[in-house]
């Protein structure tokens, strides 16, 4: 199957996909489709930043004959990017990893601008760093793309190389820096007291036997 239609559509029927936290991944989660169970690895609501990359590495170790694709934003990917050295070793199975590159912690930046009157701090990432370049220095393939068609083409080639030639590819997708709206507006509201509720109303916790 081709990924031309959405860039993150049906990669292969037997694909395993992992994602990370953040707005980029939340949007990307909408497009993959699956015909079997246990094909999608995601952090869910637990928020373990940096989950996507090591998760897809583990999936490939467990299922070496299955195509795997991980994706993460550049902030989350930076948490676990040290494992680029690991996957560069000859004995490691090949993977394909997509990194959405908007040079910022987008969700956190949007939240702080909402809370603090368009002010933000500590959310910008270094624009001189290229993850594709780091991948090449780690002995694997790194490519940069800047559009959906280019991503689709690069992803097709990367998965083919993964399955036929045992090649690991990191695809760095260059994005604009537009801040998206929070997925839950109610989460950004100021805390309020709930009328009529008192701590004494709650049942005391019991020790676990």
Predicted feature descriptions by range:
Residues 26-209:
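Thiamine diphosphate
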Residues 6, 19, 58:
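Conserved hydrophobic/aromatic pocket- or pore-lining residues that grip, position, or stack substrates
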Residues 20-21, 172:
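Short coil/turn segments at secondary-structure boundaries
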Residues 9, 15, 168:
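Conserved acidic residues
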Residues 1-12:
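Single conserved hydrophobic/aromatic residue that forms the stacking wall/gate
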Residues 14-20:
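Short glycine-rich phosphate-binding loop at a beta-alpha junction
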């Amino acid at each position: 199957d081709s990924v031309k239609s959405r860039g993150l559509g049906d990669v292969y029927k037997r694909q395993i996909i992992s994602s990370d936290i953040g707005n980029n991944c939340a949007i990307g989660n909408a497009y993959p489709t699956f015909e079997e169970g246990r094909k999608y690895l995601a952090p869910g609501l637990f928020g373990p930043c940096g989950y996507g990359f090591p998760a897809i590495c583990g999936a490939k170790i467990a299922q070496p004959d299955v195509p795997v694709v991980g994706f993460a934003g550049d902030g989350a990917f930076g948490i676990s990017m040290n494992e680029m050295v690991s996957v560069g070793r000859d004995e490691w199975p090949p993977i394909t990893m997509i990194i959405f590159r908007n040079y910022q912690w987008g969700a956190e930046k949007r939240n702080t601008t909402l809370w603090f009157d368009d002010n933000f701090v500590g959310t910008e990432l270094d624009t001189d760093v290229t993850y594709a370049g780091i991948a090449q220095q780690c002995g694997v393939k790194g490519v940069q793309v800047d559009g959906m068609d280019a991503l689709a083409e690069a992803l097709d080639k990367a998965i083919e190389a993964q399955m036929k030639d045992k090649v690991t590819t990191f695809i760095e997708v260059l994005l604009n820096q537009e801040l998206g709206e929070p997925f839950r507006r109610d989460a950004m509201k100021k805390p309020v007291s709930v009328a009529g509720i008192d701590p004494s109303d709650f049942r005391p916790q019991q020790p676990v036997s």
